[in-house]
Amino acid sequence: WDSPIMSKQFSERAPFKFKKFKKNSGFKFDFHGRKLVMYVLYGPGGGEATISIDSQAPRKIRFFDGYCSYYRMMPILIFEGNDGRHIVEFKMSDSKIDKRSILLPSHQQDFDKNPKKYEPANGYACCLYIVQ
């Protein structure tokens, strides 16, 4: 896990290390269960990822929303379905998000003052929870 700055910032609430995923990076794994949740960071440097599960159509998830002038931990429901073995593929996108238009008006001022802060399009993940 290679993001010591984020890991330190959230160490009191998450005694885990955060993995930083850049454009076109990701991982693939299988699990046995009926539900999968991933804890991630939403924030100004957040991007977009594609998640594929089994033979389902890929779907996009964002690590960015209207409040992302600061970083915060969020759980993301990756899968909920039949109990069994499932294959998950997670890959960061290289597409650019129009972050200013997503931010709430009260957070757009920060974007205007600090545009470089919003340039990265990364994903930060720290742990997966599997429910059987």
Residue ranges and their predicted role:
Residues 1-132:
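Glycan-recognition surfaces in beta-rich domains, encompassing non-catalytic CBMs
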